[in-house]
């Protein structure tokens, strides 16, 4: 029977998760988040490599291998962070691993359960939700001790879910008044500077990966604003709670949504903040050079998120950063300097507008008129919207809120529709008489010399592309007697302006172009 005992022991060894020859437990961390930015998790693993061996995997994509084809059962323990449906593609593989080894779910929203109860190990969530290099090391040490190995385990270091952070400060501020006192003291005019909120995720700071946020903060200061940088752990953490009765003048939102779970709650938060959220984004897939070479700016897979962001009133989406991967495999997010300047300049303009009395604000309301003439005016025919009626309602609302809409009675829907058709519609190329009549009816007439001064500010490469397709300025669209004409109706400081004509109106051959058409 000795042979049977030996065989049983050998079989048992094969069925048990493998242990390295050094006796160290082997752990697999499967995480879609760490896969994208594994730098600090790897650094944490190096801190405890004498006590535990950690391998990193994702679900495809990112900077670590996929678990596809990997025998996870050979590890002593698998840490799983895989929110969303992608994990279901590997459900058979993960269930097979659970039959042979321990699986502990660490990421919220993971659709596959483990075989270790997370509630029995509350420190695991504390390590994971406060993901610094130190806490990753603590997590890996904790799992080694969970497996029965005598490893020293540091307590998790926790951070507030809402705080104010500045790269020059020693640590985060939990109170807005303390932060403002510190920040204002750094500038002679600190008390009068507009307050520019910057809302971002805490994980960037904890991962030592807040270069884009730091660039925004410093650019706000350079342009004469006072940054109010707020980190949040998740999208349910409300910046308005931290601000209290303080009011910011503009908000730069480093995310696609104010509340990913509830758009209505996001709208309510925007209303509490009292300013429109100005979106900025980091391209997580491409580096700066690849982003510069792209025609679209945003990656195609961002289209859905951009559309959803509009549900919360988030406007002006801009890319301000991209991924940078070093030769040693470390990764970070790098700011795109020109984009950062532009994002902040727009925020500063919004701040000036926010401080301006309504009666002094000047507003342009564009309306659809892509085809020349009266028939295609107001809104796109496919949308079935009553643009004229909506504009009338908007003019009444503006007047009620103190905007300068002139002294004349606001026209009714039919009267406005008639005025738009008679004086506010675009004109087909070559109809110079009607263009001159538009100027007499109050249209804006931009002298060519003035336009050329503006045009010269654009990059030469862009100007060359534009002129190769449409010819030199002013072109054939809405131009007469050395002037570019924009039909408008004026109501005090509120201007209704026709949408520019579609480029192929001047050159039907443009429709046969391959690729993107340049602006006209």
Model-derived segments and spans:
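An N-terminal assembly and electron-transfer interface module characteristic of large anaerobic redox
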Residues: 20-520
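Bacterial N-terminal signal peptides
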Residues: 5-14
């Amino acid at each position: 029977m000795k042979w049977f005992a030996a065989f049983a022991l050998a079989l048992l060894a094969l069925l048990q998760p493998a242990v390295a020859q050094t006796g160290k437990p082997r752990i697999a961390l499967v995480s879609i988040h760490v896969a994208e930015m594994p730098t600090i998790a790897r650094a944490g693993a190096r801190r405890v490599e004498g006590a535990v061996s950690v391998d990193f995997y994702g679900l495809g994509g990112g900077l670590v291998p996929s678990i596809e084809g990997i025998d996870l059962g050979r590890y002593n323990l698998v840490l799983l962070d895989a929110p969303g449906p992608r994990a279901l593609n590997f459900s058979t593989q993960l269930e097979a691993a659970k039959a042979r080894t321990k699986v502990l779910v660490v990421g919220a929203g993971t659709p596959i359960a483990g075989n270790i109860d997370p509630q029995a190990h509350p420190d695991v969530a504390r390590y994971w939700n406060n993901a610094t290099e130190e806490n990753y090391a603590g997590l890996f040490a904790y799992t080694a001790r969970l497996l029965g190995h005598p490893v020293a385990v540091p307590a998790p270091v926790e951070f507030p879910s809402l705080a104010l952070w500045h790269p020059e400060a020693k640590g985060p501020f939990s109170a807005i008044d303390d932060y403002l006192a510190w920040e204002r003291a750094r500038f002679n005019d600190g008390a009068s500077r507009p307050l520019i909120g910057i809302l971002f995720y805490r994980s960037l700071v904890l991962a030592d990966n807040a270069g884009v946020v730091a660039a925004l903060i410093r650019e706000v200061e350079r342009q004469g604003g006072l940054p109010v940088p707020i980190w949040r752990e998740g999208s349910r953490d409300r910046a308005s709670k931290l601000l209290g009765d303080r009011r910011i003048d503009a908000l730069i939102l480093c995310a696609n949504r104010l509340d990913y779970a509830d758009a209505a709650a996001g709208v309510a938060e925007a209303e509490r903040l009292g300013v429109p959220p100005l979106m900025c984004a980091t391209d997580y897939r491409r580096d700066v050079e690849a982003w510069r070479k792209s025609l679209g700016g945003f990656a195609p897979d961002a289209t859905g998120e951009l559309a959803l962001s509009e549900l919360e009133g988030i406007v002006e989406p801009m890319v301000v950063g991209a991924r940078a991967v070093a030769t040693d495999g470390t990764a970070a997010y790098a700011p795109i300097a020109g984009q950062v300047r532009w994002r902040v300049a727009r925020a500063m303009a919004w701040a000036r507008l926010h401080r301006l009395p309504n009666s002094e604000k000047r507003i342009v309301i564009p309306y659809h008129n892509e085809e020349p003439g009266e028939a295609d005016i107001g809104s796109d025919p496919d949308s079935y919207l009553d643009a004229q009626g909506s504009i009338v309602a908007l003019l009444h609302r503006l007047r009620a809120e103190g905007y300068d809409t002139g002294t004349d009675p606001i026209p009714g829907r039919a009267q406005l529709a008639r005025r738009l058709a008679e004086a506010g519609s675009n004109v087909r190329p070559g109809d110079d008489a009607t263009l001159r009549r538009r100027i007499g009816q109050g249209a804006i007439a931009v002298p060519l010399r003035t336009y050329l001064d503006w045009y010269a500010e654009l990059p030469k490469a862009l100007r060359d592309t534009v002129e190769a397709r449409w010819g030199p300025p002013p072109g054939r669209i809405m131009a007469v007697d050395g002037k570019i004409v924009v039909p408008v109706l004026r109501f005090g400081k509120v201007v209704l302006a026709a949408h520019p004509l579609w480029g192929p109106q001047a050159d039907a051959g443009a429709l046969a172009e391959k690729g993107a058409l340049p602006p006209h």
